[in-house]
């Protein structure tokens, strides 16, 4: 049941590729190195079933690793074989999906060999503090004829009743840098030799960011 286990990968960018019908499609490139199981949580020990997986092993000298990684984290990873990883993620799973998985097991793109679509989760690009026109698509005001109301939100209140502005209205605020999941992306190619997964369309995050890929919840 490893096809239902999530794995971490790194977004390499986007390319164009011809599909089997000869159409040119835009694809996101995800590099998936082997993910290693560093912890197994069960119903008896933690109240639910999940795996903690590690990716991108740190190959720095021991004295450098001790400076960059906390002692509790080093002690935790020592129980799983002593390998230190730059990224750790916990992925939920059912008892059936985690059956036969043990500490130190490694898996990568082979879990997607017979999969037609996947869900990809990542952190979207941060845009900083933005106004309502960029963030929410507001129309704004007139651009000329003496108007000073160009990129404002407009009225957000009422009269003396209720005498206040309701919370939750669309206002200028921070944009991006949020967890985003894109579902049901078609798998174009699984290249086990190059450790690359090609999916149709865009995925969240900047080039080089970490994404989590799992079997699509819609299939």
UniProtKB/Swiss-Prot annotation:
Pfam families: Ribosomal_L3. Gene3D superfamilies: 3.30.160.810, Translation factors (2.40.30.10). GO terms for biological process: translation. GO terms for molecular function: rRNA binding; structural constituent of ribosome. InterPro entries: Ribosomal_uL3 (IPR000597), Ribosomal_uL3_bac/org-type (IPR019927), Transl_B-barrel_sf (IPR009000). GO terms for cellular component: cytosolic large ribosomal subunit. Signal peptide: none annotated. The keyword Ribosomal protein applies. NCBIfam families: L3_bact. Part of the 50S ribosomal subunit. Forms a cluster with proteins L14 and L19. PANTHER family: 50S RIBOSOMAL PROTEIN L3, LARGE RIBOSOMAL SUBUNIT PROTEIN UL3C. One of the primary rRNA binding proteins, it binds directly near the 3'-end of the 23S rRNA, where it nucleates assembly of the 50S subunit. This is Large ribosomal subunit protein uL3. It comes from Chlamydia pneumoniae.
């Amino acid at each position: 049941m490893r096809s239902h286990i999530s794995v971490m990968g790194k977004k390499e960018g986007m390319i164009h590729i011809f599909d089997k019908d000869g159409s040119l499609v835009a694809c996101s490139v995800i590099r998936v190195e082997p993910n290693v199981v560093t912890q197994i949580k069960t119903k008896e020990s933690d109240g639910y079933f999940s795996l903690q997986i590690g990716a991108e092993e740190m190959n720095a000298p021991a004295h450098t690793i001790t400076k960059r990684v906390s002692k509790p984290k080093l002690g935790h990873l020592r129980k799983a074989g002593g390998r230190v990883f730059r990224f750790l993620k916990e992925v939920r799973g059912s008892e059936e999906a985690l059956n036969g998985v043990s500490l130190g097991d490694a898996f990568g793109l082979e879990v997607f060999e017979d999969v037609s679509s996947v869900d990809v989760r990542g952190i979207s690009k941060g845009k900083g503090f933005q106004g309502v026109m960029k963030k929410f698509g507001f129309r704004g005001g007139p651009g000329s004829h003496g108007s000073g109301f160009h990129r404002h939100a407009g009225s957000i209140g009422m009269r003396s009743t209720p005498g206040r502005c309701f919370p939750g209205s669309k206002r200028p605020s921070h944009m991006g840098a949020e967890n985003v999941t894109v579902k049901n992306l078609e798998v174009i190619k699984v290249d086990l030799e190059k450790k690359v997964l090609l999916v149709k369309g865009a995925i969240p995050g900047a080039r080089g960011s970490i994404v989590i890929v799992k079997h699509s919840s819609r299939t």
